[in-house]
């Protein structure tokens, strides 16, 4: 079976998880990887084959991937970064027509996850607490509507890029009001919850881990925690994201008082997924089981208290 990871970048851990799970299923799996510059992608170097594709914003991106999937009989396509999610979600039917299942949520869940303003609105409408949020324009008009301290975030940003922690509203006047939202800044323990939905849209598992240390927006030290209140929030996600599918993750703050606020949703594999995988929630195995039509082993059974400490590794190759 052929599996393709797009925008593979540094997702070597994802390749390793798929290989480990394919071996446990006795499944011959060939992993392909695609990137804008695959020669400088560590994950592409680890894959069985790699391919150069246009940037996901290019009009040739989808036709190129369709051609690649058709020629190599790709059964499963796994997108790795946020910008390609709405594009691939919108073209799921075209890929399905050639026998390729795209591991991505439906357009609504993707749209909600990619707009922090909409994320806050949908969470509140579903009864899930989130920090009080205003558009930058509304905040500048009436900053006292939010309790300080506050944090300004790009509406569609990721990896903690572009975040501003202002001391006053005046410090935000140079930002584009259309591009930013402003939230009350909660202090507390930060968690990510990795969540898995099967192809029928049923949520099967939720694995919280505490983010002990973060680097460039991705957890570098973390530990799995059984947290009933956080898990209860996770199991309410299907009501908020009716067309969710595959892996998702969300981030939350837990105050010392026990209050919980969700402030971000990612409709893809989270960077900290290897911790959930090692703890006994192999989303990658469950995706392979779905692809080959065998009975799923998906279950909400995993180890609490498992710690992950990350370090840098290198890939070497001759020119």
Model-identified regions with their sequence ranges:
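Active-site nucleotide/adenylate-binding loops and adjacent lid/helix of ATP-dependent enzymes
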Residues: 107-189, 199-202, 228-232
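Glycine-rich phosphate/pyrophosphate-binding beta-alpha loops
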Residues: 160, 212-218, 222, 266-280
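Phosphate-binding site of ATP-dependent enzymes
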Residues: 162-244, 249, 253-261
């Amino acid at each position: 079976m052929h599996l393709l990871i797009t925008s593979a970048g540094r997702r070597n851990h994802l390749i390793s998880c798929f290989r480990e799970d394919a071996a446990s299923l006795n499944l011959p799996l060939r992993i392909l990887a695609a990137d804008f510059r695959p020669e400088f992608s560590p994950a592409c170097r680890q894959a069985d084959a790699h391919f150069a594709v246009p940037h996901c914003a290019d009009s040739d991106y989808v036709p190129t991937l369709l051609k690649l999937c058709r020629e190599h009989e790709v059964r499963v396509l796994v997108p790795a970064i946020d910008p390609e999610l709405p594009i691939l979600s919108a073209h799921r039917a075209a890929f399905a027509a050639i026998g390729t299942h795209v591991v991505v949520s439906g357009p609504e869940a993707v749209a909600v996850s990619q707009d922090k303003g909409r994320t806050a609105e949908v969470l509140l409408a579903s009864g899930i607490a989130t920090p009080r949020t205003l558009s930058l324009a509304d905040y500048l008009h009436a900053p006292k509507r939010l309790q300080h301290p506050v944090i300004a975030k790009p509406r569609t940003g990721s990896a903690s890029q572009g975040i501003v922690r202002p001391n006053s509203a005046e410090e935000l006047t140079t930002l584009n009001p259309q591009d930013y939202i402003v939230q009350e800044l909660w202090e507390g323990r930060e968690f990510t919850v990795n969540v898995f939905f099967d192809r029928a849209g049923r949520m099967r598992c939720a694995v919280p881990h505490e983010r002990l240390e973060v680097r460039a927006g991705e957890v570098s030290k973390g530990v799995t925690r059984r947290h009933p209140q956080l898990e209860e929030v996770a199991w309410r996600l299907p009501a908020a994201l009716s067309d969710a599918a595959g892996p998702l993750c969300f981030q939350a703050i837990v105050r010392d008082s026990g209050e919980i606020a969700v402030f971000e949703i990612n409709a893809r594999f989270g960077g900290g997924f290897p911790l959930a995988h090692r703890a006994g929630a192999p989303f990658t195995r469950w995706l392979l089981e779905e692809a080959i039509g065998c009975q799923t082993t998906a279950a909400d059974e995993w180890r609490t208290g498992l710690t992950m400490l990350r370090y840098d590794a290198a890939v070497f190759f001759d020119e």
